Amino acid sequence: MQDRIVRATAANGGIRLVAVLTTESSLEAKKRHDLSYLTTCILGRAFSASLLLASSMKIMHGRVTLRVRSDGPLKGLLVDAGRDGKVRGYVGNPDLELDLVKIDSNKYSFDFTKALGTGYLNVIRDSGIGEPFTSTVELVNGNIAEDLASYLYHSEQTPSAVFIGEKIQNQGIICSGGLLAQVLPKKDTDPLLVSLLEERCKEVNSFSEDLFQSKDNLLSLIKKIFPDIDDESISEKARSQEVSFKCKCSKQRSLNAMNMLDKSELEDILKKDGNAELVCEFCKNKYLINYEEIKLMIENQS
């Protein structure tokens, strides 16, 4: 199933609802970064969180960056997502594995809290106009969903509910995604809407299972929480949008990065190696900068 974002509203436009599926994007990241099951889930959660935030941006080239700086063995993460549905990212320790934690008599979960440890979630919103807006909040417990909800509460003062989860089987992750429900800014002082949001979200007992059952129809996932969504509240074109792992790196960007080195540094590379290989942190694509290209950079700085 193609990864996708689906949007809807409820309560006569007072509540915004967004659901996202990030299974294929998470698996692509696993392949590119050689992730463990644990880090695949963590990065998938961060993909879902960043795409949910980016979904509200008004311009298609708007972007959201999530960065976690913490003292846990994951060694942080960085994710970049666009309003266009493109997402990329990486973690500091891709092959991290930890013992599962028991959550009830027959269920176990990854230890996200131990993996991330204590630290901060940094959110950067870049609309492409003016300076990006940056906000930082302390990590709540490292499960990404509650950390994102904390950001929305403290930085945007928006009554929100965030659900993020995944489904794992022996072969690995088979489903990843999330859902965001928000009282819209002009309605956020309406106690009835805030109460409605709280009551509906209390009825969610197992989001990961709901996500798995609705992975082929995200609108049905939204309707499980808000069965009375507004009819035709959003145009069909705007309601559904494809999502994919996509990096912006290129050979030209690599050349530009090399060109920022001092002449002496370029000469040293030319003398020792004769060429340079640059590896993109986000997607692991490799770009070879050959002898002639480095020589031209040196000549241009002379």
Curated annotation (Swiss-Prot):
The record ties this protein, via CDD domains, to: Hsp33 (cd00498)
Positions of disulphide bridges: 247-249, 280-283
Entry keywords, A to Z: Chaperone, Cytoplasm, Disulfide bond, Redox-active center, Zinc
Q: Where does this chain mainly localize?
A: cytoplasm
- Please give the biological process terms from Gene Ontology that the record holds: protein refolding
Highest taxon of the source?
Answer: Bacteria
Family named by the database record: Belongs to the HSP33 family.
- Descriptive protein name: 33 kDa chaperonin
| Organism lineage string | Bacteria, Bacillati, Cyanobacteriota, Cyanophyceae, Synechococcales
What gene name is listed for this protein? hslO
